Amino acid sequence: MDRSGYFNGIKLCGKVQVVNSFPDIKVQVVSSFPDLNVKIVSSFPDNIGEWQFVDSFPDFTIQYVDSFPDIKIKFVDSFPGIP
C-alpha cells in the first residue's frame, strides 16, 4: 500500500464485497499498528478508508485472513485513512 491510499492500483475507498476466494485484497483486522483505518459508511464512501459493504457491484473485493495479509486494517468510528 502506498501513502496515497492505493494498493496495486486500487483506491482503498468505495464499495467493498467480502469474498471467500480470489479477492482483490487479503485483509487482516488488527487492533494496533494498522496500515489503514477503516470507517464503515452507508453511503458516499469517497475518502480513503471509507468502505461501504455491498453484496454486488463492488469497487473491489476483500478476503479476511489471519496471516499473510496484503494490508492490515483497523475499524474506527472516526478519522479513517492512513494513520
Regions found by a protein language model. Name each.
Residues 1-83:
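Repetitive, compositionally biased segments used for assembly/scaffolding
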